[in-house]
Amino acid sequence: MDIEAYFERIGYKNSVNKLDLATLTEVLQHQMRAVPFENLNMHCGEAMHLDLQDIFDHIVRKKRGGWCLQVNHLLYWALTKMGFETTMLGGYVYITPVSKYSSEMVHLLVQVTISDRKYIVDSAYGGSYQMWEPLELTSGKDQPQVPAIFLLTEENGTWYLDQIRREQYVPNEEFVNSDLLEKNKYRKIYSFTLEPRVIEDFEYVNSYLQTSPASVFVSTSFCSLQTSEGVHCLVGSTFTSRRFSYKDDVDLVEFKYVNEEEIEDVLKTAFGISLERKFVPKHGELVFTI
């Protein structure tokens, strides 16, 4: 696997020698704006693989995206290859409808240590929950970013990532009450510990998320990509475009239904994706917010 091919894929052309926070931030931002958070393979009759070579070929060679177990695995590899001090971590996603964290470790994230300071790096949570900068691993400190204010807190060895969100304006009244809209201003995102993980720790959940009727990834197709101003999302056949802070403390969220003839063009123009197999959009009853 060629790190230069990875840099070309994400459009990164700056220093690879300075292992500092600025470089880490740039790599994160280039990847999150080039590599979609998506599960389209599952809705094209294909599997989501964990093998790093498969992930590299899928994302770098075929210019696709993936979910956290793939996208953050690739980021972990790239940062390690560059020489950063990295640790793979596992997270438990907050499930809003039942007000609790997942019982299974379903999220992969990365810890990076720079000059004895630890940071959380995650390029694969998607939608308006995606961090745009590494988060300093410190408890109880508001960390304002473009998407929202992020907050890490620690309790008895468990860390919690939360988000304080802005108001949102939806100009099309048809979608004002859409179930895709996040209704909470204060949003819990996930919990994690600092126990080092390896990719094999995620083998069971990688299979479970692709097969269980209880998995939102089975019931819903999604694709999400950060932009310079916000984020694009395609959930089932509904396309949304969010512009962060389009006016003071308000996000603009625009909706559009995409018909079958438009899907291919939307995937190409908004997400840079060209599929090899027929895609069947799906939006089930399980809650999925943007």
Swiss-Prot record:
The active site is at C68 (acyl-thioester intermediate), H107, D122. Its EC number is 2.3.1.5. The modification N-acetylmethionine is found at M1. One of its GO terms (cellular component) is cytoplasm. Keywords: Acetylation, Acyltransferase, Cytoplasm, Transferase. Substrate binds at V106, H107. CoA binds at S103, Y208. SUPFAM superfamilies: Cysteine proteinases (SSF54001). It is an enzyme of class 2 (transferase). It comes from the Eukaryota. It catalyses: an arylamine + acetyl-CoA = an N-acetylarylamine + CoA. It is found in: Cytoplasm. Participates in the detoxification of a plethora of hydrazine and arylamine drugs. Isoniazid, 2-aminofluorene and anisidine are preferred substrates for NAT-1. No activity with p-aminobenzoic acid (PABA) nor SMZ. This is Arylamine N-acetyltransferase 1. The gene is Nat1.
